[in-house]
């Protein structure tokens, strides 16, 4: 149930996409490179070298077709947010904990650890099994929120990443604070749990603050975070 199968990838207009954004966007505090091409990711990261926090996602196509570019981007970011299959593909191991450590050390990236280390923090999205955050100062595990009715998981990874990074804005990039990372992951898990209940953005766009807070409080009690 938690394993995605890619039948075909059609890049269409993204095939030759070159990000061109306003000058004031180049001073963004938090930068998230979603699963675009490593070439685009590196371009955005190079233009935002003063960001407090940088993060990226990817998917199988780029691991297979531009591993060098992906490795270059991974050495520039603070946080990588991948699903379990992506972690194991990059880390070249069937154990995601082993793979994550190899990515963070740079061992499994193009050129190896001597070229440079990877991100300081790697978050593994594990579907119904929740998520695991491997941080240089420890490991965080959280279950998924038990959603009674699952409609469509499309976009949950992006919603998860967006909610997680939004919680880091007040921290001004202090990702070394592992408890703040834990709290951000709680918000990310809860937000993604709403997204899975509908197609597209319907559930998120119509979500009321009170309903969100009620589920957040329930999940906090479940995982022992008050």
Name each model-derived stretch.
Residues 1-32, 47-50, 213-226:
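Conserved N-terminal subdomain of the carbohydrate kinase-like
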Residues 6-8, 34, 57, 125:
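Short beta-strand segments
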Residues 11-16, 58-65:
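Short gly/ser/thr-rich secondary-structure transition/capping motifs
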Residues 35-40, 59-63:
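Short beta->alpha connector loops
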Residues 46-53, 60-143, 149, 178:
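Conserved phosphate/ATP/ADP-binding segment of small-molecule kinases
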């Amino acid at each position: 149930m938690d394993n995605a199968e890619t039948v075909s990838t059609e890049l269409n207009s993204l095939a030759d996409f070159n990000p061109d954004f306003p000058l004031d966007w180049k001073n963004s505090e938090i930068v998230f490179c979603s699963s675009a091409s490593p070439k685009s990711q590196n371009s955005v990261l190079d233009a935002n070298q003063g960001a407090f926090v940088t993060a990226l996602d990817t998917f199988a196509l780029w691991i297979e077709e531009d591993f060098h570019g992906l490795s270059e981007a991974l050495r520039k970011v603070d946080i990588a947010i991948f699903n379990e299959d992506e972690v194991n593909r990059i880390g070249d191991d069937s154990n995601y904990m082993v793979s994550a450590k190899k990515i963070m050390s740079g061992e499994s990236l193009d050129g190896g650890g001597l070229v440079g280390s990877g991100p300081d923090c790697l978050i593994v999205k594990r579907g119904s099994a929740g998520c695991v955050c491997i941080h240089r100062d420890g490991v965080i595990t959280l279950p998924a929120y038990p959603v009674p009715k699952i409609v469509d998981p499309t976009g949950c990874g992006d919603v998860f990443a967006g909610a997680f990074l939004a919680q880091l804005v007040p921290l001004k990039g202090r990702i070394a604070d592992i408890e703040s990372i834990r709290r951000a992951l709680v918000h990310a898990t809860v937000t993604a749990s709403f997204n899975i209940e509908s197609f597209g953005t319907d559930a998120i766009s119509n979500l009321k603050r009170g309903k969100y807070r009620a589920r957040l409080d329930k999940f906090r009690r479940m995982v022992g975070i008050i």
